[in-house]
Amino acid sequence: MALTTAPAVAQDAPSDVIEDIVVTARRIEAPMWEVRRGDSVLILVGSIDGLPRKMEWRTDALISAVDRADRVLFPVEGRASLADVGRLIWRFRTLTRLPNGRTSADYLSPALEARVESLTGEGPTRDSMLILSGDLMELGGYSSGGRPVSGLVRQATRANRTPAEPVGIFRGDELIEKVLTTPPERYLDCIDAAATAAEAGVEAGAQRAENWRLRRIPEVLDSPLEKAATACSYWSVMAQADDLRRIWNTAVDKALAETGITVAIAPLRLLAEPNGVLDRLEAEGLEPIGPEWRPSAPAQSAR
């Protein structure tokens, strides 16, 4: 019988109940937009990674909205078998060390290598670019141990049996193969951005998190740490950012074709970037209701 309670909103709930859910969602201390098409209501929550572990924000409003939604969408996830995990453990050194006894100085420009060494206080490193980028981002305030927004929501959907699914699934063996075989040169933009974030310092990283909580979207996207998180993401390193955009645009269109309320936890940059999801929806005549996601136009000087 418990399975029948959560999905009932779309079919039986009066409009005032739906409006109450939307009002609850608007209290979320995170970037959130409401989009409607006919009988469909889509609540887009823009998430960022690396939030401080001890950061306080109103998770109760988000969980309440998720509890009463008809369905929830999560970011793309990878699903690995025990064999995949075993392979990763077996080749752990490949994941964490540069190949053939090389160091970072063999791949980075002299100027970038000097910046990295100044930040880490060490000479050329044999750590892989994946490990080095993570170390630099932590110097910029990125918290790898923090709980992601999607993880918080996923727990809520399991507790209340709200229908939920990722917008896409990666096979574990394909994911691991790409990570293990990607040449270090593919990480150069990532290392440059991560070094810039580290140079900005943990205070700038903390301000990014605060701007996210206060829904200051342009400031979040312009922060060095957010740019580094984007440049060092799987999708950027593997040159598959366009694939991610396609996946999310398809998922959003599908959600807006279904009756009821859908809550989607999506990458903030993908939503708010120029020609991103929000721009596309607006161009199609829909009205994303929420914080302004575009930078303010420069003020015209008086003549």
Regions found by a protein language model. Name each.
Residues 1-3:
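Sec-dependent N-terminal signal peptides
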Residues 5-7:
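N-terminal signal peptide c-region/cleavage motif recognized by signal peptidases
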Residues 15-236:
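Structured, acidic catalytic/metal-binding patches in enzyme active sites
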Residues 234-303:
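A cross-kingdom marker for long, charged
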